[in-house]
């Protein structure tokens, strides 16, 4: 895959979305944003991102429920979960549901770079099938 990756960031924190957007744009990604799970599901359906970075803890529709719906719709899409400390059981559940990996908050630029590379590899792998 030679083109830009289109990544959907889903987090209820506007500040975190802004920081993630900046990190992803430095890595030459096109960035979409959603502030909750319901919006993420709609954007996944309408804008077909290459990958998703998804917070676990959000109001209304949480990250786990969002992951389940997105994976039902598009089982191949790579999803990286974001989590705060103390959510290890939830993280295990997300991996069982098909999340590619997770990043613990606070994250580093290197972790975001690695996440983008994981998404890129998965997209290329899916494309080669």
Describe every region a protein language model picked out.
Residues 89, 107-117:
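C-terminal output helix
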Residues 14-32:
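Two-component/phosphorelay signaling modules centered on CheY-like receiver
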